[in-house]
Amino acid sequence: ALMVVSDEIHCDLVFPDKQPHQMLGRLVSDQDALVTTVAPSKTFNLPGLGLSALVVPNPEHRRALKTVFDSMHMLQCNPFSMTGFEAGYRHGGPWLDELLAYLQHNRDFVVQTVNSDLPGIRAFEPEGCYLVWLDCRGLGMSDRELKAFFVHQAGVGMNPGISFGQQG
């Protein structure tokens, strides 16, 4: 049977000027084979908690996953992590609002600067998060040349687009 795992770890990082994110579980009627992942690590900058959650509507699948995770000792968490997880989601709203405003300002600055000052490179305006996709095809460089350019001349380490597929 096919299972769909929907990684929603960035779901809360949507800019106020964009459409709110709709989790996959709210869009499909048959959730029998759906697993949704969430975590406060990105939203509330709490990766040190080492805690995330799986939403598994199907009780059989939930039991099977619990058995696998128990066998690998992956369901052990400490009270500090659980408290931080809950506190982030219960009381982190004001902090998240400030974070999104800060990230939106950075997004606007980066997109404006790249699109006006860097010929051959086009920045896409993201709807959320802290990542920006750059279209560098206008530079006319191979993937290897592009990587060398960014690392050695621009002093910026990047995830090369080619690792996401031919269209980069």
Where are these regions (language model features)?
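PLP-dependent class I/II
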Residues: 1-168
